[in-house]
């Protein structure tokens, strides 16, 4: 991550008896932000393949997860305003974008906090967590980006996914 263009910001640490000031790079609204690239390092070849994500400015990459077969990498690309998120799949050997599986937008912000979780018995299905209806819920998708069904619902928060067992015929 290249933060050299981000203005240093003083952060005051009040935990010691005499406060200390530490300058951190903090991307203030309306000012330049850091530039991020995502690389995959192969210890066998000792080479790094960088994902071809396009322009590295004004975007965040979060919730990175591997496909169970290791052939692709999934991540969420989030714009700087944090109101538009895209779940993307990249080829782990070439770094090329394979597909954009889904997009989420909101007038205020989207808050992706969890990587996708593949079902251990069916690697074409994964669980995605979203607050799209105002509450954090679980959604079942396939690797083509098709919503299969909403798994949890209601005026409550799904705070953690503990696991599941396969149902016969499903």
Regions from the language model: what does each represent?
Residues 152:
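Ser/Thr-centric signal marking residues that sit
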Residues 1-50:
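Predominantly five- to eight-bladed beta-propeller fold
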Residues 22-37, 54-78, 84-92, 97-129, ...:
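Conserved beta-propeller blade repeats
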Residues 82, 133, 146:
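Short alpha-helical
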Residues 49, 98-99, 148-149:
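A structural motif specific to WD40 beta-propellers
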Residues 42-46, 92-95, 142-146:
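Short loop/turn segments that connect beta-strands within beta-propeller blades
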């Amino acid at each position: 991550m290249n933060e050299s263009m981000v203005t240093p910001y003083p952060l005051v640490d009040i935990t010691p008896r005499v406060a200390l000031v530490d300058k951190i790079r903090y991307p203030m609204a309306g000012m330049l932000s850091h530039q991020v690239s995502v690389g995959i390092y192969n210890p066998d070849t000792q080479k790094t393949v960088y994902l071809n994500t396009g322009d590295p400015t004004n975007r965040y990459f979060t919730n990175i997860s591997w496909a169970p077969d290791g052939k692709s990498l999934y991540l969420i690309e989030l714009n700087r305003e944090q109101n538009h998120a895209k779940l993307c799949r990249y080829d782990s050997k070439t770094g090329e974008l394979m597909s954009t599986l889904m997009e989420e937008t909101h007038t205020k912000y989207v808050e992706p906090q969890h990587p996708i979780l593949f079902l251990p018995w069916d690697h074409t299905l994964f669980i995605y967590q979203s607050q799209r209806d105002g509450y954090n819920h679980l959604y079942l998708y396939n690797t083509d980006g098709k919503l299969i069904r909403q798994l949890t619902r209601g005026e409550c928060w799904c705070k953690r996914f503990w696991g599941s067992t396969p149902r016969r015929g499903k």
